[in-house]
Amino acid sequence: MMPIKSIVTLDQLEDSEYLFRIVSTVLPHLCLDYKVCDKLKTTFVHPFDILLNNSLGSVTKQDELQAAISKLGINYLIDTTSRELKLFNVTLNAGNIDIINTPINISSETNPIINTHSFYDLPPFTQHLLNIRLTDTEYRARFIGGYIKPDGSDSMDVLAEKKYPDLNFDNTYLFNILYKDVINAPIKEFKAKIVNGVLSRQDFDNLIGVRQYITAQDRPRFDNTYNIADAARHYGVNLNTLPLPNVDLTTMPTYKHLIMFEQYFIYTYDRVDIYYNGNKMLFDDEIMNFCISMRYQSLIPRLVDFFPDIPVNNNIVLHTRDPQNAAVNVTVALPNVQFVDINRNNKFFINFFNLLAKEQRSTAIKVTKSMFWDGMDYEEYKSKNLQDMMFINSTCYVFGLYNHNNTTYCSILSDIISAEKTPIRVCLLPRVVGGKTVTNLISETLKSISSMTIREFPRKDKSIMHIGLSETGFMRFFQLLRLMADKPHETAIKEVVMAYVGIKLGDKGSPYYIRKESYQDFIYLLFASMGFKVTTRRSIMGSNNISIISIRPRVTKQYIVTTLMKTSCSKNEAEKLITSAFDLLNFMVSVSDFRDYQSYRQYRNYCPRYFYAGSPEGEETIICDSEPISILDRIDTRGIFSAYTINEMMDTDIFSPENKAFKNNLSRFIESGDITGEDIFCAMPYNILDRIITNAGTCTVSIGDMLDNITTQSDCNMTNEITDMINASLKNTISKDNNMLVSQALNSVANRSKQTIGDLRQSSCKMALLFKNLATSIYTIERIFNAKVGDDVKASMLEKYKVFTDISMSLYKDLIAMENLKAMLYIIRRSGCRIDDAQITTDDLVKSYSLIRPKILSMINYYNEMSRGYFEHMKKNLNMTDGDSVSFDDE
């Protein structure tokens, strides 16, 4: 037995292998009318991943994404300016997000349930967020994930020892921080944006405002760093005529630019002296406390809501020196004015006041409940039916929220249950493959299967499968094409057309239709001998061999005429050749007459549109052909016959060849980044499409019991019943899908029956000739010699003919019954079930014949009518006195 820990589960698989398992194991268990919840059709992707790669945002809800980007911008500014948080392990620069290798500030309150999942299929920042969420507290994960609590919902209030400021409003902070075209300056926090090659007007005005507080010695370096002179010329500003800076706090028109200097430039440039009522200020902290208090006076109560311990007073003491350099302490107290002491944490509180100011003039973000963050109540999850539960657990990462020591944590739901914890809510993260959520792909695939009744594919016009030559003429033309040497394109076309016309003139007989198996070879030989560039590509799509033949340049009547004229043919002569070779040219220009293959998305990679310089039409002729794969090529015969144990049988993928091709097609679709459910459906092999849920059979095999389980159907479609019979004989091995296998087996028996009825007809005709000669002799005796042959002699002869036909039909039935049993036993043997001890009785033969009879009923009726015709003909010629004494009775 395989150890339980070594079993590969769906959450350990990725890309095509994962999608294949979903399609082959989960999809067959869903009803075709199964409705996927709209909330599960989108997923969560960390905004950092989307900002670096816009295509990743296609699987998210746009309103949730915009809300998360706004919230994340606020949280990032709070975190990067704080002295104690430092939860983000990234640095946002112009056009890039750099990962910090130093450990982030994860709390000591780590998750007691150890996470063993890596989530390698997720984008890097989403993967990192999940690792943090399953390691640290849920509250911290929500902070660095941009979570916004929905209003009026049953979302959970997570528990945490310490909580951070929660601000919520529309903003473009992240976009501004990541704006690519900025001046490369030593100060990374202030990003001077370049618009149309010039410093933006807003940044220019702010820099001019800051510039007035920079000392004269540092001002040239400042101007050079930010190209102030160029921007001033562009905006028509004369730097030499700027007004002198106002450096007195009592008369400053605004404190904005002095605060900006403190926020961004204090450590790079020297500041001019600042005064209060003519006295020089001595301490920078007092300058900032005064400026911030005056500029953000209305926001101080809001600040206290977040930081109740911050000192707030009705006055402020400023330490200054008067013009005589004497120390003067000034106590400033203004009516209805409060002064806040930011405790020398200038950078954080300046940033936080700016956030509060932005919040005051912006609208709050409204979001709905998130399946990733808020999820659903655990009781609601448990109440879902088995089908929903199976679908969710196979297409989503399933997490659970639980409380431990007054702290909320998140872990894989199965890990929580294994740890004997009680989940409170269940959160879902739908997986993404090829740029789409798996849940959405399954929904599209189910819709495609439900809406398409037949597997359509572009096919050739079957009415044009000849070139107007008889079989003899076609073979001569075919041999001539094989002898054509390499010649210039124009010359080769002319010689082939003229050779065809020559053969056509003396050809007699009905047109020979090209066989399907030789069609592609003839196409290749015909166009290659004419000098066209012919390329062939072959692949497998579904359970069909796909052949793509491209012919360049494109074949049209006008192109042939133009080419013939290049070989010294006049236009009139070229038209005559075209007329004489009408059937050939009609065949050539009609080879690609099928439904537009470009409407089938999944075949575009096989049939790309090309454009070649020098080609009159600018494209080529495409021939697309599809042929079903034979059953022996579809199944893994080597794997089946090499399996000797039950485990080996269970591990054998019977349809390995076509499943491998299916995986390759899935990989190609995923790599394209534009996979759809229709792609999956059209690439799906028959063994998955036709799969039904079956149960294993009993421990022994009884031919009679198997045949008793089969019922006759009016439509002669025995596939489902025989599939049930076969699956009932598989003992304890894994249930396998035999729909297509049984269907082909029955068709094989039916074809064999046609051949057998032909042999029987020939034998019957030869034997009937003896009876005919006997009847002729009786006729001669009575007509010529006027002797009378008794009715008992005539009746005896007719009875013997009836016995002959009955014996012939009985032999035919036994033969067909044996053929049918042989086909079914062959399938059972392939399925891994032992049939050595099975005994076949006469009753089994009768049952076997009854099963196949609906498929060969027309042939049986034909034979009976033929025999009846002989019987009635002989009876008429015998001229019996009592004609009703003998009659021909059939089934």
Curated annotation (Swiss-Prot):
Coiled-coil region: none
Q: Name one GO molecular function term.
A: structural molecule activity
Site location (Cleavage): 614-615, 697-698
Q: Which key words are in the record? A: Virion
Task: Name the residues of the propeptide.
Answer: 615-697
Please give the InterPro entries that the UniProt record associates with this protein.
Answer: Poxvirus_P4A
Q: Which domain of life is it from?
A: Viruses
Quote the cellular component terms of the Gene Ontology held in the record: virion component
What post-translational modification information does the record give? The precursor is cleaved by OPG083 to give rise to the 62 kDa mature protein during virion maturation. Proteolytic cleavage of major core proteins OPG136, OPG129, and OPG098, which occurs at a late stage of core formation, is required for production of infectious mature virions (MV).
The record's family statement is: Belongs to the orthopxvirus protein OPG136 family.
What do we know about how this protein assembles, alone or with others? Interacts with P39/A4.
Q: What does the UniProt record say this protein does?
A: Core protein 4a is the most abundant virion protein. Major component of the virion core that undergoes proteolytic processing during the immature virion (IV) to mature virion (MV) transition.
Q: What is this protein called?
A: Major core protein OPG136 precursor
Q: What is the lineage of its organism?
A: Viruses, Varidnaviria, Bamfordvirae, Nucleocytoviricota, Pokkesviricetes
